[in-house]
């Protein structure tokens, strides 16, 4: 929605509906907090990684970073997710690194591959947690998204903010991209700015990439060794991926943007060049292995998060678990 990032006449026309959306969502949150509507308390601490706005803000790299950081502190970690893009006939569903992305969803499969922790998907977060704990003991559970899922009680909250796009025109849906107003940041435990520091946070996440991996041969090659190619991305903010590639000196002859959680097929790429390198995100790659070509490369990224607030956040979780609170 391009008008979400400008204060156009369309946005102003939709403001009455935005007010209704905000009013209903705030009332719903208050009812959960007051205990009038029943919410679920898990037997282990829950950490929410979410955002205030619609679209790709970089939650998945943060989830992977968080899981690894907690593992390094000796904690057993599990992950739950709604599983956007999943076509499973049964929920809750345990997702492993070998799960078909069409069944498990691209992001849950990627998280399982990168962290090797148990992942469970379901729109019903309580059922996902219960199945997860039946399968493997967990000291803490990370929820990929779910900031507005107040039916699930939480112990810690992280919000990821896209430093480039911010909160768009500042309006709540449908006039703007916001699910909640920026004032919601005052009540979360950690705000991470994706890209650079901004007015909302000095805790910064940068996505570090050094090499590309061939989908067929598994060969690794430094990105600086490529001169040109084409690229596609089916993520929330494809331009960020293209800009990153260009930053390594790669001349992109063609770029293709797809919807987030796009379903890919061999037919979709029939007209793509079979000669020049073709780059994609790791999230997209998990769906493309069955029909990959030898000129296809995916680019793994690693979240680098700086700031004492992030260190303190991890320490607080570890302390909570060890104290049995």
UniProtKB/Swiss-Prot annotation:
Residues that, per the record, bind ATP: 53-60
Keywords: ATP-binding, Kinase, Lipid A biosynthesis, Lipid biosynthesis, Lipid metabolism, Nucleotide-binding, Transferase
Enzyme class: transferase
UniProt keyword Isomerase, yes or no: no
One GO BP annotation of this record: lipopolysaccharide core region biosynthetic process
GO cellular component: plasma membrane
Reactions the enzyme catalyzes: a lipid A disaccharide + ATP = a lipid IVA + ADP + H(+)
Keyword GTP-binding set for record: no
GO terms for MF: ATP binding; tetraacyldisaccharide 4'-kinase activity
InterPro entries attached to this UniProt entry: LpxK, P-loop_NTPase
UniProt-listed Enzyme Commission number(s): 2.7.1.130
Pathway this chain belongs to: Glycolipid biosynthesis; lipid IV(A) biosynthesis; lipid IV(A) from (3R)-3-hydroxytetradecanoyl-[acyl-carrier-protein] and UDP-N-acetyl-alpha-D-glucosamine: step 6/6
PANTHER family: TETRAACYLDISACCHARIDE 4'-KINASE, TETRAACYLDISACCHARIDE 4'-KINASE, MITOCHONDRIAL-RELATED
Protein task: Transfers the gamma-phosphate of ATP to the 4'-position of a tetraacyldisaccharide 1-phosphate intermediate (termed DS-1-P) to form tetraacyldisaccharide 1,4'-bis-phosphate (lipid IVA).
Protein name: Tetraacyldisaccharide 4'-kinase
Native source species: Mannheimia succiniciproducens (strain KCTC 0769BP / MBEL55E)
Gene that specifies this protein: lpxK
